[in-house]
Curated annotation (Swiss-Prot):
A motif ('HIGH' region) lies at residues 127-137. Pfam families: Arg_tRNA_synt_N (PF03485), DALR_1 (PF05746), tRNA-synt_1d (PF00750). It is found in: Cytoplasm. Belongs to the class-I aminoacyl-tRNA synthetase family. This is Arginine--tRNA ligase. Its EC number is 6.1.1.19. GO terms for biological process: arginyl-tRNA aminoacylation. It is an enzyme of class 6 (ligase). GO terms for cellular component: cytoplasm. The keyword Nucleotidyltransferase does not apply. SUPFAM superfamilies: Anticodon-binding domain of a subclass of class I aminoacyl-tRNA synthetases, Arginyl-tRNA synthetase (ArgRS), N-terminal 'additional' domain, Nucleotidylyl transferase. It catalyses: tRNA(Arg) + L-arginine + ATP = L-arginyl-tRNA(Arg) + AMP + diphosphate.
Length: 578
């Protein structure tokens, strides 16, 4: 609807330029917002105040001329001037009802991408292999997954890329330890303890560390024995990751793995091409690119090191190789990097070097979707009581157990296997939603008690809200798609719910553009609250007439489908009863 209003305003502006009221060459960003007070309209624009000065008119006078120049629209019943010159637009409720009827008949609930479909690479999760995933991997994994789901739902071709850390010193360390301590495959599957023991040896013994580095050199040279061990470690580690992804209900598979090692053969070419472009400078034996835009506190340009003095390559080299693979081989239109906000400088430098070097042959928009930190109650990065790293699988297991106990207390008569299933859906959903509902760039404090609360903006509340809607149809023995009739909007609570339902597509496009799932979370929470008010004030099963009951059932059906689809786009399963 906002796009429709923007188009109407643009047509009015064009007319006023033709009439000589406005000067030529204006290209304002037309802002349309939801009106705060519904008695004064559904949407508001400040366009008259923005253009009053170039028009040489008072805002209210320009607003009057804009209203007169607005084309007629079946979607708008009237437009009024408010305050210093706001344009307030009132929706035509009949047109709104028709749009909702159409949405109910549409698999995508009326949601369409604002622009043309694109090919989008999502760089997400990216754990370092050789040890198990920890809580620090949660945000990249689930935020990336949610945005990928939304983009796919809107019609984009999404390529997920799990840029795992599958190369480097840690593998030499593990191979050296395995040479000293031959163990069985079963023992090796406990990778965390094996890694911890190897790291202890590496830190304590210089001889061991030297041997480990030597094995890395052999690995890089393609030594068959080292490659076989590396493959074994990698497969075990990826198997651990896959179990975590499945528990998280994240759409990542082995086929999505595109680790650091995938770019090994191109690293020397990256350095050679940078040199050919005249971008490389040798600094203390290292090969660097210096960009004037990025300076240290002393005002000196910061180096982007692509090759160390000993010939080794760095993260920047691998990321540059990945950029040109994604642009020139995958032909992506966008590449979204869901990586910690603290890596912002690194990616800004890499993107700029890639542009200057001509690595982005196919036009590709590169966006670092940085995120904040998940902290403990003390406001510091989340740790175990003894200060260690929390395994992600352990956190999720605890969430399942806590939710199971909570659900069992509320529903002691349910069979244990059903309680276990509900506990898993609620527990995993609670952890994910608590994260996704926060602004991507914000830090937040992890709190089991808050996230498992059945009140407030939480997964349990939304899951229960969905079961309420499903319960109405269960009583009737109908599905959401088995209600005839037409939607007719009469009561204020019906209109409020309808107006919010109509915004689903706009919300999804916002998430797709900015990579911000919290916007979808806020929308679903608001929608659940509006349905609750509608349900309490507009009887469905006890409606006054059959046509009124059908209309309200259709509103309820669209609410149920929107809640279910919205939660699915966040990566949350739903339940038919709790």
């Amino acid at each position: 609807m906002k796009d429709t209003i923007r188009q109407l305003i643009q047509q009015a502006l064009t007319q006023l330029v033709t009439d000589g009221v406005l000067p030529e060459g204006l290209s304002p960003a037309i802002q349309v917002e939801n009106a705060r007070d519904k008695t004064h309209g559904d949407f508001a624009s400040n366009i008259a105040m923005m253009l009053a000065k170039p028009a040489g008119m008072k805002p209210r006078d320009l607003a009057e001329k804009l209203i007169n120049a607005l084309p007629a629209s079946a979607d708008i019943s009237k437009v009024e001037i408010a305050g210093p010159g706001f344009l307030n637009f009132f929706q035509n409720t009949d047109a709104l009802a028709n749009r909702l009827d159409a949405a109910l008949a549409d698999a995508h609930l009326g949601a369409r991408k604002a622009g043309p479909a694109q090919k989008v690479v999502i760089d997400m999760s990216a754990p370092n292999l050789a040890k198990e995933m920890h809580v620090g991997h949660l945000r990249s994994t689930i935020i990336g997954d949610s945005v990928a789901r939304v983009l796919e739902f809107l019609g984009d071709n999404v390529i997920r890329q799990n840029h795992v850390g599958d190369w480097g010193t840690q593998f030499g360390m593990l191979m050296a330890y395995l040479q000293e301590n031959p163990i069985t495959s079963d023992e090796l599957s406990d990778l965390e303890n094996f890694y911890r023991a190897a790291k202890k040896r590496f830190d304590e013994s210089e001889e061991f560390a030297t041997r480990a580095r030597g094995l890395v050199v052999k690995l890089q040279a393609g030594d068959p024995e080292c490659l076989a061990l590396w493959t074994r470690f990698k497969d075990i580690s990826l198997s651990h990751c896959q179990k975590t992804y499945e528990l998280l209900n994240v759409k990542l598979t082995m086929a999505d793995v595109m680790g650091e090692s995938a770019y090994n053969d191109d690293l020397a070419n990256v350095v050679a091409d940078l040199k050919a472009k005249g971008l490389l400078v040798e600094d203390q034996g290292a090969q660097c690119v210096f960009l004037e835009e990025f300076k240290n506190s002393d005002g000196d340009p910061l180096p982007v090191i692509v090759q160390k003095a000993d010939g080794g390559y760095l993260y920047a080299t691998t990321d540059l190789a990945a950029v040109r693979y994604r642009s020139n081989v995958l032909k992506a239109d966008r590449a979204l990097y869901f990586v910690d906000q603290r890596q912002a400088l690194h990616f800004n430098q890499v993107f700029e070097v890639a542009r200057r070097a001509g690595f982005v042959g196919h036009p590709m928009q590169m966006e670092h979707m940085g995120f904040g930190t998940m902290n403990g109650a003390d406001g510091r990065p989340f740790k175990t009581r003894d200060g260690g790293t929390v395994k992600l699988i352990d956190l999720l297991t605890e969430a399942k157990e806590r939710a199971y106990a909570l659900v069992k207390e509320k529903n002691p008569s349910l069979a244990d296997d059903e309680l276990r299933h509900i506990g898993e859906v609620v527990g995993i959903g609670a952890v994910k939603y608590a994260d996704l509902s926060k602004h991507r760039t914000s830090d937040y404090s992890f709190n089991f008690e808050l996230m498992l609360n059945f009140e407030g903006n939480t997964a349990p509340y939304l899951l229960y809200a969905y079961t309420r809607v499903a319960g109405v149809f269960r009583k009737l023995g109908k599905g959401f798609d088995e209600v005839d009739g037409k939607i007719v909007l009469q009561a204020a609570h019906e209109q409020d719910l309808a107006a919010r339902l109509a915004q689903f597509g706009e919300i999804l496009n916002n998430v797709a553009e900015k990579g911000t799932p919290h916007v979808l979370c806020s929308y679903l929470y608001d929608l659940a609250g509006l349905f609750s008010s509608f349900y309490e004030n507009c009887p469905i099963l006890a409606a006054e007439t059959p046509s009124q009951q059908q209309s309200r059932l259709r509103l309820a059906a669209l609410t149920g489908r929107t809640l279910k689809q919205g939660l699915e786009l966040l990566g949350l399963e739903t339940l038919e009863r709790m």
